[in-house]
């Protein structure tokens, strides 16, 4: 019998976040996120106040499905052009880690 669940989580995971686009519908974009343990997540949340949107995203992301290359400059362009992007991405990250919306 194949085991599908492991106690050791993968170092990264992928999830889609809906990026708000002014004047239109939100667009789902797939991101690759860093995994954090429960204790690491608690510490990250405690120290998140005052962190810039760019720094927050650099702290949780390792990649994305966009045709633009992933990096600090591209993240800066993202948060400058789409003000709701950072909150949407961080919310999705936290949601995935705590499994808030898992259901039937």
Locate predicted features.
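Acidic, low-complexity intrinsically disordered segments
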Residues: 45-104
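Short, charged/polar N-terminal "headpieces" of proteins
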Residues: 1-46
């Amino acid at each position: 019998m194949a085991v599908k669940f492991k106690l050791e989580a993968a170092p990264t995971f992928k999830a889609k976040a809906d990026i708000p686009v002014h004047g239109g519908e939100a667009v789902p974009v797939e991101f690759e996120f860093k995994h954090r343990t429960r204790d690491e997540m608690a510490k990250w949340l405690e120290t998140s106040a005052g962190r810039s949107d760019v720094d927050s995203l650099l702290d949780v992301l390792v990649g994305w499905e966009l045709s633009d290359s992933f990096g600090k400059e591209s993240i800066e362009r993202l948060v400058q052009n789409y003000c709701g992007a950072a909150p949407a991405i961080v919310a999705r990250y936290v949601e995935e880690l705590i499994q808030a919306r898992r259901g039937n």
